């Protein structure tokens, strides 16, 4: 068995790769460019260039063929189209198993990853698992992410969620579940909502960060329109800005509170990390204010 990880320079794939190195699972990483720690396993791959598709599935001498693919869709407005094209190519090369990274609010047949989910479900003799994590904790700590820069620069977090709650999850836990799914003997054509253990409002996130950092962090509450404008000011495309703001409004109405999931422990046998644990480990990300 050889696993192909798309989105190879992304946060989740990096953690999956680390797990596979420790457990000696053969894998390749597909992305436009390599990164530290993945160069020896790298295959040049571009979702928008079908000529790179064969290269992504090419294995080194002595390796078994690719048998399962981690699908991490690209950050495109019409992300489903290129991913579906690659799935169809992979199936033509006898790949029969896929694990898709989707999102908690996106069901089969919905927009974006929902279309990919629906397509996987329609292919005869293909088995799959869809992972639907809620919002990433690491959005608060990754350099360049709007929330991270807002904490560093302005000591605030922005949202249009009002008092809506989110069970934020760490990329580390998503990767652990993904590694289990990618190495499972069988996949059951199922989807799984992944959540962290703490159901938090953004007010509570700000309060937790205040305690960890020793300086006041606030929650700047906005309307959906105000948040979209703020995101565009920070360089986000209009399509992404309006989509993100609309998702905040869904959170405001309770979209992330309706399902309680213990899938992380069910898959891995270990409870997911809590927000305070995450914040303590990432303090350095918020220390410098520029």
Swiss-Prot record:
Protein transport in keyword set: no
Gene3D superfamilies, sorted: NAD(P)-binding Rossmann-like Domain, UDP-galactose 4-epimerase, domain 1
An MF annotation (GO) of this entry: oxidoreductase activity
EC numbers for this chain: 1.5.1.46
Record keywords: Alkaloid metabolism, NADP, Oxidoreductase
Top-rank EC class of the record's enzyme: oxidoreductase
Reactions catalysed according to its record: agroclavine + NADP(+) = didehydroagroclavine + NADPH + H(+)
Keyword hit for NADP: yes
Highest taxon, organism lineage: Eukaryota
InterPro entries in the cross-refs: Ergot_Alk_Oxidoreductase, Ergot_alkaloid_biosynthesis, NAD(P)-bd_dom_sf, NmrA-like
UniProt pathway annotation: Alkaloid biosynthesis; ergot alkaloid biosynthesis
GO BP, one annotated term: indole alkaloid biosynthetic process
PANTHER family: PRESTALK A DIFFERENTIATION PROTEIN A, PTHR43162
Description of how the protein assembles with itself and partners: Monomer.
Function: Agroclavine dehydrogenase; part of the gene cluster that mediates the biosynthesis of fungal ergot alkaloid. DmaW catalyzes the first step of ergot alkaloid biosynthesis by condensing dimethylallyl diphosphate (DMAP) and tryptophan to form 4-dimethylallyl-L-tryptophan. The second step is catalyzed by the methyltransferase easF that methylates 4-dimethylallyl-L-tryptophan in the presence of S-adenosyl-L-methionine, resulting in the formation of 4-dimethylallyl-L-abrine.
Protein family (similarity comment): Belongs to the fgaFS/easG family.
Name by which UniProt lists this protein: Agroclavine dehydrogenase
Organism annotation: Claviceps purpurea (strain 20.1)
């Amino acid at each position: 068995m050889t696993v192909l990880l798309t989105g190879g320079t992304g946060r989740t794939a990096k953690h999956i790769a680390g797990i596979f190195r420790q457990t000696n699972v053969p894998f390749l990483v597909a992305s436009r460019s390599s990164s530290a720690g993945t160069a020896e396993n790298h295959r040049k791959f571009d979702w928008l260039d079908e000529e790179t598709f064969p290269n992504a599935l090419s294995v080194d001498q002595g390796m078994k063929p690719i048998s399962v693919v981690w699908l991490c869709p690209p950050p495109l407005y019409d992300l489903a189209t290129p991913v579906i094209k690659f799935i169809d190519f992979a199936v033509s090369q006898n790949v029969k198993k896929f694990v898709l990274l989707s999102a908690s609010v996106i069901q089969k047949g919905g927009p974006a990853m929902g279309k990919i989910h629906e397509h996987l479900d329609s292919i005869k003799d293909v088995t799959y698992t869809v992972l639907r994590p809620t919002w990433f904790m690491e959005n608060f700590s990754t350099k360049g992410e709007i929330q991270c820069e807002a904490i560093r620069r302005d000591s605030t977090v922005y949202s249009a969620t009002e008092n809506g709650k989110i069970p934020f999850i760490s990329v580390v836990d998503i990767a652990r579940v993904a590694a289990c799914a990618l190495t499972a003997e069988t996949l059951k054509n199922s989807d799984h909502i992944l959540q962290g253990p703490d159901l938090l409002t953004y007010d509570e996130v700000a309060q937790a960060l205040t305690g960890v950092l020793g300086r006041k962090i606030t929650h700047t509450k906005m309307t959906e329109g105000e948040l979209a404008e703020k995101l565009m000011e920070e360089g986000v495309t209009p399509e992404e800005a309006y989509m993100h703001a609309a998702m905040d409004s869904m959170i405001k109405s309770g979209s992330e509170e309706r399902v309680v999931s213990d899938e992380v422990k069910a898959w891995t046998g270990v409870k997911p990390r809590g927000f305070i644990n995450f914040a303590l480990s990432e303090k350095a990300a918020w220390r410098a204010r520029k």
